[in-house]
Amino acid sequence: MWPGIAEFQNVNTIGHTDSQQRWKDAIDCGSKYGDKELLHINRQGKYNEFKICMEKKGYHRFWPAECGYQNPKWDTGKCNL
């Protein structure tokens, strides 16, 4: 499975989202750098606020099943780190 942060993809570059820019945006939206599973915002009960903030910045959140797995055999090409 892909980490939670990888499920957020820039709508203009799905599958090739700039990781550094996504981290900057995620931090602006309340996440902590390096928290790939988004545990910090989940523990604070702010996941929905985070998701809305990321959408306003031009991201689409894919469900884990839409991303597939990091294994190339099962990767759908929609998510990246």
Describe each PLM feature range.
Residues 1-81:
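Mitochondrial intermembrane space
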